[in-house]
């Protein structure tokens, strides 16, 4: 602050650790009253995050909120020039002085009211999209629901029993679909895609392709757009941890086997007496692997534990071994983990850098070899009838949609919100919101919970 505190237009210059904190906001208001200030410059983080915060401070201080300037010295200086502290500081000083000069030239403004279109576009007909559409319609907005596939429901529409409530996913989605199709304010378009967007926040015009070639189109005026396109599961490459061998299934394939059959477990006509689960397949991969996913998929530990409980219900005598790196059954889901142990599941912790090895035996069975960290790295061999690869979640690539809506995409392929805590569904494109698994790996319950936010933001 010493670099600018003596500038002729500066009356008060202060520094703070967290400018957005309540204590610092109070100091700003007090200085504005004591010094009879008429404008405000804040040099901190992104205006996308805190413009409204400090406009509110200006109002409470008796200033015109439009005679405030936010100077972004975090993203534009501190984070950008981590290897040049001196240069970053000099740049920050120049930016702050530019902000002061800009503020000196501002004039008081008064907000105006602009009519907006009371209709929302929801992209994606999975469980998050269905719930978002219903939530928006229930507060009186017209909704256009666009689904790329021929049917609604997404991945959850193919699920059987789900945790922790045990409800059937297909039945749950079927009820949601009936509610959506019966609602007078919701228009459902399947086999449809968003082709283009024009206009501005509150008054967008979107073009929807109604056939695969995009020849037949429809245009809708919408005030906001909610993206709920979901995610997909990781597909192992052939040979990865034995994938492609008889008796090696991914977790979704194993779950389908449980949902679609009854009686004693069998695989290819052979009884299943021993199951080995290998965790973190397609998640927490080494950064050097091309196309690898370094993130944790979060939901799959609990999903695997739940599947093991279902298998134990089918055959209480089945032996189940879980080869995990870290067990992340967070919150109340730890109760499922405890229950699975009580029912006989054995959990063996394996090292990050030495994954299990799956071998096909001449007898047709499988053998899984791994080092158990809980026994100081002792190598163990597990004869198994079935190996389940606990696969994670990956982003559903959609370059055309990203281009049409100008969606912000992270390095992991998921769509980015402005801030995970403060603005969890807003994107940098005003009026374009995201919810569900298109943001990050999450289970269906979390996807449904987050869908309530778009209605809050759309209605202000």
Indicate where each model-derived feature is located.
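Residues forming the flavin
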Residues: 1-460
